[in-house]
Design a protein with these regions (language model features):
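Cytochrome P450 heme-binding "Cys pocket" and the immediately downstream C-terminal segment
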Residues: 292, 423, 440-478
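C-terminal helix/juxtamembrane-tail motif
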Residues: 478-495
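Conserved cytochrome P450 K-helix/beta-meander segment immediately N-terminal to the heme-binding cysteine loop
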Residues: 382, 388-418
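Classical protein tyrosine phosphatase
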Residues: 275-298
Length: 495
């Protein structure tokens, strides 16, 4: 099933649900908003995705069925991740992220190596190397924008959650993570894993990632037991509480090494794969529209700005002040731009196994929207599979008018107090019900912090030509990657 075939079958059926038979199984594809909400409302004894999750962990991460067989340990790990939904974690994580970005935003690109007197010059940051930064004599910089952004953002977020020693000891961690992401759909197809170059790179990268995450786990577990993990790991005192707790869960439940390292790789990938890419696509859409760029900069100016007292970071670059609360509450346009980016960029399928027969009924408004005379009810039998066709719904002109157009205002409406407010409406990129994304609240603040800070600190233009063009989307991992990276010229707005 892909977006093209799903769109064709949706349009041909005219219904809120249509079905496929693949082998011995029957798959019911949901493509109407009111039906999606009913799916989210079902309990786990009616609809769940446990078998799908077990299959994915076995196929994508080679967990050798440990997710299936070590039930207590696996669910203990997921319960520990629930901390990411709690206000204390969100405030801690976003506060630490904002503090880092206030200093690091000006360091998206640093300074040319030849400006330093030592013979070997100043080494590039890892994200600069990934973005193949070129330092121009006129004070501007050139870089591959996608690789620069996803690795810059990944460095800060990984350091904040897992501590700085992880990447310090495994400097190729992000390169491996993005190689895995590029080829994960080849791995899932199985026979492509060893045939295609992307598949082979992904398998090799996955192996290195599991080694890195197990070494990190062993070091933290050793520290928690009151022993010295070794000088290369340092104090390990900058690790977030949620990751500290997960190590304790693995120890308490006597989880196997395979379960620990494969699930830790899945969390590392999951934390980065959507947010980092969305910041890239969001920045590309905004920088390529001068009026939108101007409006967003004006909107965020009171809440994200250069330090009024001229503070500078330890490297001498200008420091930002970021008011997270003001950014979230009083900047509807940039938040709507984030939602619109997800609508156009994230194309995934939500899977639910049907444990008991379930009846789903179209709403009258949705039936009218789809041109039907009356709502239809569907009985979905136990033993079948429900598929939520998020990607095709997000590009359905009946649900989102002019879906090919980047139009953030579609998510802005007037609130009860007359002020504009942003609502996701029929956008379900964070899932819902039992399977709502655990990192949703942090992810939204994280994306706005990174995007707003870079919009304030940097001008971005094409290396060739007058207008920045948004690249075409390919497929990789959970969110789309560009088919080709885009080479840009960056200029720091404040020195």
């Amino acid at each position: 099933m892909n977006d093209t075939s799903l769109t064709a079958h949706r349009d041909n059926s005219g219904d809120g649900i249509f079905s496929y038979r693949i082998g011995s199984g029957k798959y019911y594809v949901v493509n109407m908003p009111s039906l999606v909400q009913q799916v989210f409302a079902q309990r786990g004894n009616v609809l769940n995705k446990q078998r799908t999750l077990e299959w994915f962990m076995k196929t994508a991460f080679d967990d050798k069925f440990s997710t299936r067989d070590e039930h207590e340990a696996f669910h203990g790990h997921h319960n520990a991740l629930n901390l990411m939904l709690k206000e204390d974690f969100i405030n801690e994580a976003t506060g630490k992220t904002a503090c880092a970005v206030e200093v690091e935003a000006a360091k998206l690109v640093t300074e040319a190596p030849w400006l330093y007197p030592d013979a070997e010059g100043k080494p590039m940051e890892l994200w600069e190397e990934a973005g193949q930064v070129r330092f121009n004599h006129d004070g501007t910089f050139e870089a591959n924008f996608y690789d620069l952004i996803v690795n810059y953002m990944g460095q800060i977020v990984i350091d904040m959650l897992w501590g700085k020693a992880l990447i310090k000891n495994h400097p190729n961690l992000q390169a491996d993570m993005w190689h895995f992401d590029e080829g994960v759909h080849h791995i899932i197809t199985k026979f492509l894993a060893n045939i295609t170059a992307a598949g082979r790179r992904a398998v090799a990268a996955r192996e290195r990632l599991t080694i890195a995450m197990h070494e990190w786990h062993e070091a933290v577990a050793t520290k928690q037991a009151g022993r010295d993990p070794g000088a290369q790991w340092g104090a390990l005192d900058d690790i977030s509480q949620v990751m500290q707790d997960r190590v304790k869960v693995w120890i308490a439940t006597k989880a196997s090494e395979t379960l620990q390292k494969t699930n830790d790789v899945s969390v590392l990938w999951g934390v980065n794969v959507n947010s980092n890419k969305n910041v890239f696509w969001m920045l590309m859409q905004i920088y390529s529209r001068s009026h939108l760029l101007s409006d967003i900069r004006e909107e965020i100016a009171p809440y994200v700005h250069i330090s009024p007292c001229g503070e500078r970071g330890p490297d001498g670059f200008p420091k930002l002040n970021i008011n997270i609360d003001g950014l979230m509450k009083h900047c509807p346009l940039i938040k709507a731009a984030f939602y619109e980016t997800m609508r156009m960029n994230m194309s995934g399928l939500g899977i639910r196994e049907v444990i008991k027969d379930v009846v789903l009924k179209e709403s009258a408004s949705d039936a009218e929207l789809f041109g039907k005379k009356r709502p239809q009810a569907y009985t979905i039998p136990a033993g079948s599979t429900l598929v939520l066709a998020n990607g095709t719904m997000q590009m359905d002109q009946r649900i989102f008018a002019n879906p090919e157009q980047f139009y953030p205002e579609r998510f802005i409406e007037e609130g009860p107090d007359g002020a504009p407010r942003v609502t996701m409406k029929n956008l379900h990129t964070f899932g819902g019900g039992l399977y709502k994304c655990k990192g949703r609240y942090f992810a939204e603040k994280e994306v706005l912090i990174f995007a707003s800070s870079l919009l304030v600190m940097w001008d971005v233009a094409p290396v060739n030509g007058e207008e920045l063009e948004v690249p075409k989307m390919g497929y990789a991992g959970a969110s789309r990657s560009p088919l080709e990276d885009v080479r840009v010229r960056l200029t720091r707005r404040y020195n």
